[in-house]
């Protein structure tokens, strides 16, 4: 068995190692594609605290732009409303966590990815590369305009609980160890570089 790691593999590796930004990314992708059951049923990761935050913060929000992209027959459509709220809640958490990393490491030269502080909820716009664009939604109850990258206390609780769940999930750790043992970013085979 030989595995070349892709973007998703690396994000899962980071999540298993306890990177909160990677954990948020893994959950966001799972929510977007209607695969939260992989986390809950497959790995036993409890998402109740996140679901509670999502339902409290976005109860009346249609979560425009956070729809679940699923295949017919593979997904219980009754889960869509909750999954969309989870998708939005974890996306905002992810943007905040990534913002912390970007600010902590200016050498990454990723300041252009910092957009939460460029949003104007009153006008319903965001400034990107000097041009103003309309927002699809202005419902961001967990964003503090004075410090948009600060996690709320409830978000911090969710993040810490999820971090512990990912780091202490033996099945996930076993799968990630397998990726480390049997995989790499590239392979040289028959004199050819494979990546």
Locate each region found by the language model.
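Feature recognizes metal-dependent phosphohydrolase scaffolds
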Residues: 1-195
């Amino acid at each position: 068995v030989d595995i070349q790691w892709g973007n998703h593999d690396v994000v899962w590796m980071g999540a298993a190692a306890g990177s909160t930004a990677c954990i948020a990314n893994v959950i966001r992708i799972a929510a977007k594609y209607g695969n939260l059951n992989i986390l809950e049923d497959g790995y036993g990761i409890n998402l109740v605290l996140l679901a509670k935050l999502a339902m409290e913060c976005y109860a009346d929000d249609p979560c425009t732009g956070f729809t679940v992209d699923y295949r017919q027959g593979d997904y219980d459509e009754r889960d869509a409303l909750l999954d969309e709220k989870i998708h939005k809640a974890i996306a905002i958490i992810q943007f905040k966590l990534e913002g912390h990393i970007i600010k902590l490491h200016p050498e990454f030269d990723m300041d252009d990815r910092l957009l939460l502080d460029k949003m104007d909820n009153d006008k319903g716009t965001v400034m990107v590369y000097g041009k103003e664009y309309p927002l699809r939604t202005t419902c961001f109850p967990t964003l503090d305009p004075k410090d948009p990258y600060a996690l709320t206390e409830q978000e911090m609780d969710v993040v810490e609980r999820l971090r512990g769940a990912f780091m202490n999930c033996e099945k996930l750790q076993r799968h990630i160890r397998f990726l480390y043992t049997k995989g790499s970013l590239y392979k040289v085979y028959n004199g050819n570089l494979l990546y």
